[in-house]
Structure formats: structure tokens, C-alpha cells
């Protein structure tokens, strides 16, 4: 047995995927394996999810791969496993992910039992911070469970496995999701009813189940008979131990409200006194985006010429909301829903090509007196005039995302500066290159 393991290690050692050297297998799933990988340039370690295309051929993979991969780049949060790069060969999709070494929260509870309320609340706070961030990006997980909550070396949680088991159904005219997905014990009643549901509300239900397990060590709804299990879920009202604090009991009860309309929201959760005890908000990495240059190639899917990564000098960029779109559990509905929050980030659509858009944007902002720095499909725009407070007038990043060949999204992101000037810039660009009507612009 030992000899066989040594032979397997020798066989695995030296396997290459571009600049990555693949090592031991960390896990296996329905569509492939997860392997340890080391970046031979930086020396950093990663986990590579290797997906066999032949196993998802019946899911219209070739069509769905046209979705926009750059959406994954938006998910930059300390409590969400980071996707660093996606490499595709003729037979495989290779997702280079952040390596999380602490195992599953599920295993910790199975081994050690329930957490104390203080420790459990800390885990729950991190979970809600991560999910709240996803929802703010218009992304809904839809398969939240303890097995999809990992722990890093410091014991902090990392939400993972946004799903690769099936393709999502499209939103219908009612604006609701109609795909029944998720693990039975964690699924919300409205999902089981298959009448359409709000992705955010269903995620809150699943988080409520997770909180219950963290604090009690058992599932709120469980039965070997699926029909009975579904009846329990739809009824709600799980037994809540009296030894939990009133705040914890109230939180569980409000999260496991079978009515999605009256179920507590993320805002309500964060406003509760129980949640706010010793709460230290997690800070997303979004604000670093304007300061740190990111090689766009690191967030594109490159079509390798072979499994070893010896491709042509001009790799094919695969447009893919797809790595999210492939998932029955990860939905992007909110990405294009209007939000009256602030003007820090504005998106609008255009029928022009990405190349033409960048040229037109550069011309327009130059005429307005802005300086421009260009890199890949991104422009960094600055107005150097200082206001009365001595601050630089405005700094904005403009980026183009391809949804399909005849449709692009222009995203403007303000780092700092005058909101009035930012609005003038947006209105000029919308006039010159945009197709969105005022009702279709997305403001976040």
C-alpha cells in the first residue's frame, strides 16, 4: 500500500499546467478532481479544480462558456475563496483557486461538537459578511451548507463551492429563480415549492440552518424520508434549545421563517444586538482594485494548446459569466438590477465592440481634460485639478466586459473625487458610446 502511494506521488510530481506544477489530489467530485498546485514562478501554493468537459457535455457547455469570466473577478472578500485564474484545454477546465488548509467547518463540528455561542457567533458574523458581499454584487450562492464553509489556518471561514453540478435555468418574466437546487436539509421552503424565489432570501434560510448546526450540533430539519423532511422544512418552527440566549433563539427563528417575505434580511441581521456583539466587520478587497495593477490575463480563460500549457502566443479568451453560469447554485440576477445605493460604480450597455468602446472613451475623456492610462481592456482616468480641500478632482477606472459579441457592458468605478464631475463624465460617455436608457443604468 505504501509503495503504491509512493508510485502515485512520483507519477503526479512533475505534472505541469502552464506555470503550475500539480501535486497530490486534495479531493474528488462529480466532474473532476481538486489538486494541490505550486506556482513555479512565485512559489505560492494553490488548489486547482480540474473539470472534465466530457462530463458536462450534455449541459450545453460550449454555448454557456460564452458568459463573462470577469464577473468572478468581482468576488474579492476575505471570507470567500478566491479564483485566481482559469485555464482551459480541449478536454479540461482548470480553475486555479486559493488554497484553504483548515478543512471544512462540518468536519470540525462532527469531530468536536457544537461551538460555544461566542465562537459560533464569530463564525456566523464572517459567514454573513461574505454572503452580504456576494449579494451586493448580485451573486447568490444557492448551495450554502457546512460542507461549503472552509476554515483557513487561522480558523477564519472561507465560503466555497459555488457549484458546478448543472446549468441554471434562466430567470422568467416574474424576475424570480425557478431552479430547485441546494442540499435538501439546507433548502428553503420556497425553493422546494418550485414557484420562483428570491435568491437572497433563500441564502438567508440556508445561513439560518448553518447557524442552528453551529450552535446546537444538529440539523433543525432532518428525516430519512425526503417527503417527511420537506414537510418539516415547509412548516418551519424547528425545536430551539432553551439554553441558547434569547438573542440567538430569536435570530434562528427569524432566519428560519418559512415565509420569505417576512424572513429577516441581511440588513436586519446586521442590525440585531446579538449579531453586533464583538462584531468586527470584514473589509472587502474591492478598494484595493484601483491601487493594485492586476494582470487581466490572470482572470481570463486561456485555451491552452496542450495539457502542458504549450499554447500559441495568442491565447483565446473565452468570455464567461460561465464559471458562474455553469453553476446551478450561483446566480447573477442582481448584477443587472438597479440599486439606489451610491454612484461609486455605474454600468451601462453598448452595442459597440470592446476596441471601439475603449477608443471612444479615451477620446471623450481626453476632450474633457482627463489624463488616461491604458492597460488591456481597462482605462484609468484622472482629473488632476485640485478642489478647495486640496484633493485631486477625480479618479475613475473604466472597464469593458463582453456579454456576447453584439453586447458589451461599460463599468465606471470611482476611486475618489467630485461626484458632480463623475456624473458629468458618465453622462458624456453614455451619450457617446452607450445604449442604456436612464432606467437601465446600474448604479451601485
Swiss-Prot record:
Modified residues (Phosphoserine): 165
Gene3D superfamilies: Kinase associated domain 1, KA1, Transferase(Phosphotransferase) domain 1
Cofactors: Mn(2+)
Residues where Phosphothreonine is found: 179
Enzyme class: transferase
Post-translational modification: Autophosphorylated.
Domain Protein kinase stretches: 20-275
Keyword check for Phosphoprotein: yes
Binding of ATP, residues: 26-34, 49
Region (Activation loop): 161-190
Keywords: ATP-binding, Kinase, Nucleotide-binding, Phosphoprotein, Serine/threonine-protein kinase, Transferase
Record domain NAF: where: 313-337
Classification via CDD domains: CIPK_C, STKc_SnRK3
Protein family: Belongs to the protein kinase superfamily. CAMK Ser/Thr protein kinase family. SNF1 subfamily.
Domain notes: The activation loop within the kinase domain is the target of phosphorylation/activation by upstream protein kinases. The PPI motif mediates the interaction with the ABI (abscisic acid-insensitive) phosphatases.
Full protein name: CBL-interacting serine/threonine-protein kinase 1
Record organism: Arabidopsis thaliana
Amino acid at each position: 500500500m505504501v509503495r503504491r502511494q509512493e508510485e502515485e506521488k512520483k507519477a503526479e510530481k512533475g505534472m505541469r499546467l502552464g506555470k503550475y506544477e500539480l501535486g497530490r489530489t486534495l479531493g474528488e467530485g462529480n466532474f473532476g478532481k481538486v489538486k494541490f498546485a505550486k506556482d513555479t514562478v512565485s512559489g505560492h501554493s494553490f488548489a486547482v479544480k480540474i473539470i472534465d468537459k466530457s462530463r458536462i457535455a450534455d449541459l450545453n457547455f460550449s454555448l454557456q462558456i460564452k458568459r463573462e469570466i470577469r464577473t468572478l473577478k468581482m468576488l474579492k472578500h476575505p471570507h470567500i475563496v478566491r479564483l485566481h485564474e482559469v485555464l482551459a484545454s480541449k478536454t479540461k477546465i482548470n480553475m486555479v483557486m486559493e488554497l484553504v488548509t483548515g478543512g471544512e467547518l462540518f468536519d470540525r463540528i462532527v469531530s468536536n461538537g457544537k461551538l460555544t455561542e461566542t465562537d459560533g457567533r464569530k463564525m456566523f458574523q464572517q459567514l454573513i459578511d461574505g454572503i452580504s458581499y456576494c449579494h451586493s454584487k448580485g451573486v447568490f450562492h444557492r448551495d450554502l451548507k457546512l460542507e461549503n464553509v472552509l476554515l483557513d489556518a487561522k480558523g477564519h471561514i472561507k465560503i466555497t463551492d459555488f457549484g458546478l453540478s448543472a446549468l441554471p435555468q434562466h430567470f422568467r418574466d416574474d424576475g424570480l429563480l425557478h431552479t430547485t437546487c441546494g442540499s435538501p436539509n439546507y433548502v428553503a421552503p420556497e425553493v422546494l415549492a418550485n414557484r420562483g424565489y428570491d435568491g437572497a432570501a433563500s441564502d438567508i434560510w440556508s445561513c439560518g440552518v448553518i447557524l442552528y448546526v453551529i450552535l446546537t450540533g444538529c440539523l433543525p430539519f432532518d428525516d430519512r424520508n425526503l417527503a417527511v423532511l420537506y414537510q418539516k422544512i415547509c412548516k418551519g418552527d424547528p425545536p430551539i434549545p432553551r439554553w441558547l440566549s434569547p438573542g440567538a433563539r430569536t435570530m434562528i427563528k427569524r432566519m428560519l421563517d418559512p415565509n420569505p417575505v417576512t424572513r429577516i434580511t441581511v440588513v436586519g441581521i446586521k442590525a440585531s444586538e446579538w449579531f453586533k456583539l464583538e462584531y468586527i466587520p470584514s473589509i472587502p478587497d474591492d478598494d484595493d482594485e484601483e491601487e493594485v495593477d492586476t494582470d487581466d490575463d490572470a482572470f481570463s480563460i486561456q485555451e491552452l494548446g496542450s495539457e502542458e500549457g504549450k499554447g500559441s502566443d495568442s491565447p483565446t479568451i473565452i468570455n464567461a459569466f460561465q464559471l458562474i453560469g455553469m453553476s446551478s447554485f450561483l446566480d447573477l440576477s442582481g448584477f443587472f438590477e438597479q440599486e439606489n445605493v451610491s454612484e461609486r460604480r455605474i454600468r451601462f450597455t453598448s452595442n459597440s465592440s470592446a476596441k471601439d468602446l475603449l477608443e471612444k472613451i479615451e477620446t471623450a475623456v481626453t476632450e474633457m481634460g482627463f489624463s488616461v492610462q491604458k492597460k488591456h481592456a481597462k482605462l484609468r482616468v484622472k482629473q488632476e485639478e485640485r478642489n478647495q480641500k486640496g484633493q485631486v478632482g477625480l479618479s475613475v477606472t473604466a472597464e469593458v466586459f463582453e456579454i456576447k459579441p453584439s453586447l458589451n457592458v461599460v463599468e465606471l468605478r470611482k476611486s475618489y473625487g467630485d461626484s458632480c464631475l463623475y456624473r458629468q463624465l458618465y453622462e458624456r460617455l453614455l451619450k457617446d458610446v452607450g445604449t442604456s436608457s436612464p432606467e437601465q443604468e446600474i448604479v451601485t
